[in-house]
Amino acid sequence: AALQISPGNEAHLHAFGVEAIGNDGVGRQMYLHTSPEFAMKKLLAAGETRIYSFAHVWRNRERGALHSPEFTMLEWYRAGEPYAAVMDDCVALIRLAAETAGSPLRYRDRFCDACLPPERLGVVEAFDRHAGIDLMATFAPDGTPDVDALRSQIGPLRATDDDTWSDLFARVLVTRIEPNLGQGRITILDRYPAAEAALARRLPGEPRLAERFEVYACGVELANGFGELTDMDEQRRRFIAEMDEKQRRYGVRYPLDEDFLAALARMPPASGIAMGFDRVVMLATGAPRIDDVLWVPVGERP
């Protein structure tokens, strides 16, 4: 269902709110989903093992060459399989798109041969290689991030006293890391910091990192995947921390979906991934803007 009681609980993820009015005339706050993730994990908890969704999703405050407020997401899950399985799925689908289009993936002046074996690069290694930052030195042994330790390594990159560790991490990622990814071949950026785990489980034996990855071509993020977290209490703590930050930053917070959290406790080990379908089409056709591959782009203000 596209209407949800909670659209997702990430600090910088913005949803479209709607009012659902019942037969009694009483309104109820609902949201257009930003991803089918919550609904699909409820299905995993109910016993489904291999599922996918190919649907429109909505995200507010997103507009640009690579962003549309409404876009198409392909999301799928494999119960009982490691997250490397959905990595392989994703690469195979991107390769199929390139083969069908009959040309390398391209965006602006960048090219990517999807038929070549992908590069699998750890986030820690990427920060060292492309930004000269020792990311592991910015974590406590339990994975707690130290904003001052990261601030001391970012050099001339813009920073403010209000920035969190996650703010600085994202700024380095976008400005110094992402432009170097997916050049010539697909890059799988793997093993994200636990502080950026979202809904991913921690890496076994290394609590500072998580089973989260993103797939890039031509410097563009195409997909985001997890080895899925099934610890209800841990997920609740993460959601509350994210909503506290959202409240501090934007003055709003979204409710928690208690049915979803209860489903996590029953969900089997699984891996899952969400792919931005329109971005794949963009790169396969060489389109410069996402609006060029949407059947009916969201209209601009007159």
List each model region and its residues.
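Metal-assisted phosphate- and nucleotidyl-transfer catalytic regions
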Residues: 15, 96-222, 226, 241-267
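A residue-level signal for conserved active-site and pocket-lining positions in enzyme catalytic cores
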Residues: 32, 47, 76, 126, ...
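Short conserved micro-motifs at the rims of enzyme active sites and ligand-binding pockets
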Residues: 43-44, 64-65, 200-202, 226-228
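Class II aminoacyl-tRNA synthetase-like tRNA-binding/catalytic domains
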Residues: 1-85, 95, 178, 282
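Active-site pocket scaffolds in enzymes
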Residues: 232-302
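Internal, well-ordered alpha/beta segment that forms a basic, Gly-enriched binding/recognition surface
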Residues: 42-49, 58, 79-124
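Short, glycine-/Ser/Thr-/acidic-enriched flexible segments
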Residues: 23, 37-39, 57-59, 78-81, ...
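Hydrophobic (often cysteine-bearing) scaffold residues that line and stabilize catalytic clefts
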Residues: 32, 36, 86-90, 165, ...
